[in-house]
Amino acid sequence: LIPNDQLRSI
């Protein structure tokens, strides 16, 4: 799965 860092693309 993708790390939360990827979701932190805000």
Curated annotation (Swiss-Prot):
Kindly state which keywords UniProt assigns to this record, in alphabetical order. Answer: Secreted
**In its keyword annotation, does this UniProt entry include Secreted?**
yes
Q: Where does the protein end up? A: Secreted
Q: Which GO terms describe its cellular component?
A: extracellular region
Q: In which tissues is it expressed?
A: Expressed by the venom gland.
> What main location does UniProt list?
secreted
* Other observations noted: The primary structure of this cryptide Pep-3 is identical to that of cryptide Pep-3 from other Tityus species (AC P69940, AC Q5G8A6, AC P0C2F3).
User: What the protein does?
Assistant: Does not induce hemolytic activity, lactate dehydrogenase (LDH) release from mast cells, mast cell degranulation, and antimicrobial effects. In vivo, injection into mice causes moderate edema formation, but induces very weak or no change in nociceptive sensibility. It also reduces mice locomotion, suggesting an increase in anxiety, but causes no alteration in rearing (standing on hind limbs).
Any idea what this protein is called? Cryptide Pep-3
Source species: Tityus obscurus
User: Which classification does the entry list for the species?
Assistant: Eukaryota, Metazoa, Ecdysozoa, Arthropoda, Chelicerata
